[in-house]
Amino acid sequence: MIVLNSKPLIIGLSHLGQIFSVGWASKYGKCSVFDTNNERLNAFKQGNLAKEERFLISSYKKNKNKISFLKDKKEILSYKNIFITIDTPIDHVGKPDYDYLFEFILNLKPCFPQESNIIIYSQVYPGFSRRLLKDVFVDRKDISLVYMVETLRLGNALHEFKYPKKIIFGIDKNKFPQILNKFSCKKFIFNYETAEIYKAAVNIYLFFSVSFANLIDNFCRENNSSYQDLVAPLRLDKRIGKYSYIQASLGISGGHLERDINSIENNFNNHISKKIIYYLKKNDQNRINLLKKKIKKISLNQTIGNVLWVGASYKKEAFSESNTPLSKYIFRNKNIQQLFVYDSFFNLKKKKYKIIKNLKEFNYKKVLIIFNYASLKDIKIIKRIVAKFNCAIIDISINSALRKIIKDSINIYD
């Protein structure tokens, strides 16, 4: 009888796999990693990790000696506990590609040894695990398939992986792998569907909170009121809470909430419930029109030849260009000739805009600045640009230091 290696094998080294492997090595000890994508695998070997995650790179360097690298997928046959940690891809509006994940697992199937534990940590839709049992593992009754819910927040994911308050698992026929007892926090063990719906439920709740804020903001605009004035007292209501997602915005972005919203909408059979989500999405998508109206108002008094967008991601703590205010702006302004983009924290790849690498060198007249986020140092440079060109600046950020430094900035939410 072949004795399998019991230490975890982590397959899929996108953001999620990086967090899992480094977090495991840091807290629990030795692990092995692999990825069928050589670019991701080599980047991980070289320590080119997600820069937006605090302490991830330093923790990797400290614990790299605990991480072993597989050279070939045939080596997977030696491992009993296999974690699938590839991030489910999303497009520019947050639509998930679950077929990619399905094919990723299907192609690995011949490498899964007898009596192995396959733990899915990737983002899935309700019914995905059952589909794997039916369409992939129907002839592999020896395999124990587990779905482990991922609820990590970008920017703080490593800490949350190492110190979870709870973990939800979906299992079949009470098959719970011993290795999962390494996690000493509160565990909730459900069937596949309940665990999968929990993950979706969290994001749907957050989506409804954002929708509430934007809905009331719309109502305030029609009734000579400011929603911004309501946020602080709303947070003091214990039924709402200080950590609630009730800040008005230009709509959800980043792709992570959108992934589950799209999944729930597509899998709902109840017509009324499906319509509720549909119209909330419509309201969310229309929020970008606030920016369009501000720009139109400014253009009545100022010729706008160039636009400088500061802060390309959906937030400064984590990088994603999926469904961001910038991507929405580009989608609705396809004919714009001069769009410049600068980011204080992330290296940008050339897209449909011109990348500014040094704000001090920006020297374009007739410019409108749209501010999302920036470092304090760069905000001071922006102040000098505003003074030099006498240009308008629209602040679309939720909370920033900009308004304290540039008094004439136009708040999108006022």
Predicted regions and their residues:
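Structural/interface elements that position substrates and couple domains in central-metabolism enzymes
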Residues: 1-414
